[in-house]
């Protein structure tokens, strides 16, 4: 830990006046996930109206001015009520978390993946000023059908993003947070201050520093279960055409994307895109590199430059995929001035695109269900249903 008197932690609640002061917080901020921050505060009012706090926007400030996490308060509780001071617990989440509370059965027709994502967001009041797509370079054809069966809107949104290789992150300021989608590494912002590796001093003030960074190796890490995706015509798009049982090698010849033997039509270009993104996702899952820092400004989805690490290959740019924040300020209780902050990091090489891991699968429909269409319904007859529905 480092004592940093320049990073006080504050919580500003929209349209609400209180004497609540933050004594500690912890929170996990990860790429392609919904963040959650647990905040402990003290106040002199033992009868604080907790219902009045729910659904209010709030900004948890830590680090430099205007740096922090914005969200909405989804939980509020009184942990201890004393004669002179009371302890409260608040939970801060993004507006996107609302999608986790609606589970339904529905069929979406003739929508691209970005169109489906926008429709899900707007159904929960997340309008265009609170979400955007940037640096979108891929092909996203319309899906004839996309089935939502007993899964939440959030699960469906994350599943579609995982299937298409679209990542999302959050941008924060004191007034709001914005949900940002992209499929290109160019969309990741670069952290302005590089992280210099330095061993922790036993005492005294310490500037923003990378305290630890190392790779975790495992015998079982990266072992994957083979999955064969069947295309609409019943053929596996990545299977060698001329492969024979018992042949010494069944690899297709490699052709650069820009060569004459490259994609000749839309379907072939789409297959190459899916294959490339699957390979990128596998590469992202192969290595497990973690670190620790007292740098309060680190957020998931940022590119961080590492300097002065004793292992030279770590001195490079890294994509932060997960940041586990923890902080406390004991001077609120004791009249002292220690500010302990810690961020546990998980990173990828800058060249990786941060493709989301395929951790969410569509629900299995095991019974016949009736449905009604409010408008014109176009039925699709084919021998195989697309596995990405």
Which positions does each model-derived feature cover?
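Amphipathic alpha-helical and helix-coil boundary elements used as assembly
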Residues: 1-389
């Amino acid at each position: 830990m480092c004592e940093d008197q320049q990073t006080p932690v504050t919580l500003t609640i929209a349209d609400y006046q209180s004497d609540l002061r933050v004594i500690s917080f912890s929170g996990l901020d990860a790429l392609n996930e919904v963040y959650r921050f647990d905040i402990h505060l003290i106040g002199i009012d033992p009868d604080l109206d907790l219902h009045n706090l729910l659904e209010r926007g709030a900004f948890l400030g830590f680090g430099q001015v205007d740096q922090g996490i914005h969200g909405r308060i989804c939980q509020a509780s009184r942990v201890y009520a004393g004669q002179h001071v009371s302890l409260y617990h608040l939970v801060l989440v993004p507006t996107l978390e609302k999608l986790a509370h609606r589970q339904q059965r529905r069929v979406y027709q003739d929508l691209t993946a970005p169109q489906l994502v926008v429709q899900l967001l707007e159904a929960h009041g997340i309008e265009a000023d609170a979400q955007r797509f940037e640096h979108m370079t891929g092909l996203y054809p319309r899906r004839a059908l996309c089935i939502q069966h007993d899964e939440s809107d959030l699960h469906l949104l994350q599943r579609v993003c995982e299937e298409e290789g679209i990542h999302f992150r959050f941008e924060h300021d004191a007034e709001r947070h914005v949900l940002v989608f992209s499929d290109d590494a160019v969309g990741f912002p670069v952290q302005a201050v590089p992280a210099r590796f330095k061993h922790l001093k036993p005492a005294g003030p310490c500037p923003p520093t990378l305290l630890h960074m190392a790779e975790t190796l495992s015998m079982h890490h990266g072992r994957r279960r083979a999955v064969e995706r069947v295309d609409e015509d019943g053929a596996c798009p990545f299977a060698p055409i001329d492969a024979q049982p018992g042949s010494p090698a069944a690899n297709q010849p490699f052709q650069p994307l820009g060569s004459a033997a490259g994609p000749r039509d839309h379907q072939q270009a789409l297959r190459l895109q899916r294959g490339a993104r699957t390979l990128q996702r596998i590469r992202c899952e192969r290595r497990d590199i973690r670190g620790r820092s007292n740098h309060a400004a680190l957020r998931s989805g940022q590119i961080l430059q590492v300097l002065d690490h004793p292992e030279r290959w770590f001195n490079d740019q890294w994509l932060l995929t997960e940041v586990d924040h923890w902080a406390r300020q004991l001077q609120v209780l004791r009249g002292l001035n220690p500010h302990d902050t810690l961020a546990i990091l998980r990173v990828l090489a800058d060249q990786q695109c941060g493709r989301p891991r395929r951790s969410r699968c569509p629900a299995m429909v095991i019974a016949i269900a009736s449905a009604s269409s409010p408008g014109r319904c176009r039925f699709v007859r084919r021998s195989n249903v697309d596995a990405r529905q």
